[in-house]
Amino acid sequence: MENNGYKIHVAYGFHVNCYHSYRGDTNDAAGFGSDIRIIRGIIKTLDELNAAGIPVKGTWDSENFFSLEKILPAYAPDVLDGMRRRVKERGDENIIMGYSNGALGAMQEDELVSSVALAVTNPQGSGLKDLFGACEMIVRPQEVMFTPSQVKTYNKLGVKALCLYYSCVPFDAFKTLIPPLDDEKAYNPLTFEYRGEGLIVIPTYSNADVCDAGCLRAWVKELRKKQLDGTVKNDLFLFINMDADAIFWESLNLPVVKNRIANTDGIRGLVKEVADLEYVVFDTPGGYLRTHAPVGTIRFTQDTADGNFTGYASWAEKPYNRRIWTAIEKSRRAAKARENEEDFLNRLKLLSTTHFGLATPVLNIQREQTANELAEKLMDAAFLPEGPLTLYNASGTVLQCVQLRCKTAKALAVKGEGLEAYTVLPMGDDSVFLLLRFSEVKKEYVITAEETENAPCGDEAFFTLESAGTKLEFGADKRIRRFSINGQTVGGEEFLSSYLTYGGKRYDFSPDGMEIGWLTGGRYIKLFGGVGLPKAKRQGAYAFTFFTSDAVKGIFVLADVSYPYTPERDAISTENSSLGRYTDMRWQEAAPFCLSFENERPVSVIKRNFEGDISAFRVDSYAEADPKNRTLDSFNNQLTAGLIGLTDGRKGLLLGFSRSVLSSMACCPMRLTEGGRVKMNPFGTFDGRQRHHPNRSGDVVPRTYTLIAPQGKSLAPSYNGSRERALMCLTPFEGELPDEERMRELLAFADGAFATGTDTLLAPYNGENVWVQSAEKQTGKVRVRSPLFGGVKGNPVKYAFRGARALGYIVKKQRRAK
């Protein structure tokens, strides 16, 4: 084999974010102390390697507001000095993470633009150009959160490329979304295309991928062999990027073996393993892009994130997530009526992924307190009770939907200029939800209300709700029998299921009764009953109020679920995770309103992101990327800006939900079962087997990773003792999508109106629709167990066996690579 002149460029990326969901705000092991220690060590080691003649460079993607502006200047100015010096003297590179380590993929366009722009330069001087003099216009999104329509926004910003994981473990962005890439494409820039726009994507790898190859030297030699035999006809770029506080960057100093085993000597070992190979070039992403063009094109329409189940689960499926996200949505609605720079910046800060996850099943208490304070600021700013009761039109249509505080339990008559029809839905406390249709589109509507007689009612009993060809039929057994559109069945007797999985056993919600009645401007059928678990301190209850409206087509449902509360005795603090609280890890799944779609052909998921883009992806694409993913216990690659749904091309089901009542960035996980059937789990969470990722180690490393990764645990314990109230619209349709008018109405319901001012009976609602169980103060003798050995994800023998197999694999590959 001849030397063909091709090189392998290796880059090391350090993801600097000192603001964690699983640790607090102190300069010690319970806070950001380990970040500072490890980053100092990285800088020191890189300096030593350079002094020894090895021209290694670092690539830093750093969070600005919390880390560069607050924490590091106060507690570790030497770290900033070291980073600045290395940029100037050693060619280190800074790339963009985002101003407040925000959930970039779930941002509106204005939020994304500001997050990137402020990361480059800002008045506080914490921008990358402010601190380091320069930065590459390359974005490594926090948690690799990305939605395809943002290609256009990134292009407007002058962003050259995104770094997205193409990884062998669930800490990944797109490896399971597209057919496997050959090595020439997997280690080179690619062009991502979406609706006529293109943006470079750099496939990125983590320390888990290094272990999957055995060691970096084995990985590089394997790729070199393909260059020499002609399988690969190009230079290759291997970008290893991981959290800067990861222990893999520092020497583990293991007894006896003394760091002689690969992957135990931190950044020093990773560099020295390949420093003697003449075909290795130490580089940076920007450096490689300056001399290398994209070698291929990729396309996918899923939304990416690197959380549990390779998606958005970790930041979107906990009740607490929805509490914080709904405050963000209310702030967004308020901005339609009142622009305020301070509110906007507070919203950017609250959009930090750290206020939602990755911590599982709950956040660090201190982090939760900070998020609560920011959310309260946004809620207070959005509460404007002065003047007449006015609805600001956020949807640009004649349909206005809003939750309001109500001072009476009596029926209401609502008045307003041009008001043609309306429905009043009591929400079960001191609030109501109004659906109002006006005769023409205006920027704002003034309304008033007065008490009236109870809603008119008929004498007949009914077991069916109908609206514009949609029929929801109930049986005397207090269950749904059939859901259809113009005679086509969308769901049968299994259409709706409600259950918890606890301690390995399924517990279905217990129906107690069914209530039939009339609303002002509609009629309803309410199903209600109990939600029980064994030995619960407090049992739960549910009520699903299905109703129709004179103001708009569709069948709506108010879902109010109070979960049982079980004793919490499992500690969830570890060496790397200081959550400071207990939980009950026997909770495994929460499926309060699980919907089964009766498809006849392959299914596509319809979704809407927060830029307003509506797109779809085929669930078959998972199996096309990896046949082992023909079924998936859970997937959440679908952002939910008020809309989510399924279609088989002939018929479909859209679920709209009021974003200002209850929402999250991705509130509807799904399950793909045999035969291509999909279950939707709005405001719930699934558990089970993680998605399979193609890998080099015969699943040895990925299986070990999924066993020990704390974010891989179930999110269901976060539902313990909580209560949530959501308002949804069930919209079956024929064809691939509903007609434009129906879609416009559904989005108007989802986006809602923003209310200011006060009437004698009605006022803006500034309360909650999600209540989270307070952390229980432990007293007396408590049997505390680590969730690592709680039985939910295995036992110590399994951990030891898989760990030994992984270690043996690494040692074997290391020996062969000498």
Set out the residue ranges of the language-model regions.
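Terminal accessory/anchoring regions of large secretory-pathway or extracellular enzymes
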Residues: K258, D265-P511, W518-T520, Y524, ...
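Conserved, mostly hydrophobic/aromatic
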Residues: M97, V139, I240, T284, ...
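A conserved active-site cap/scaffold subdomain adjacent to cofactor or substrate pockets
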Residues: N234-V257
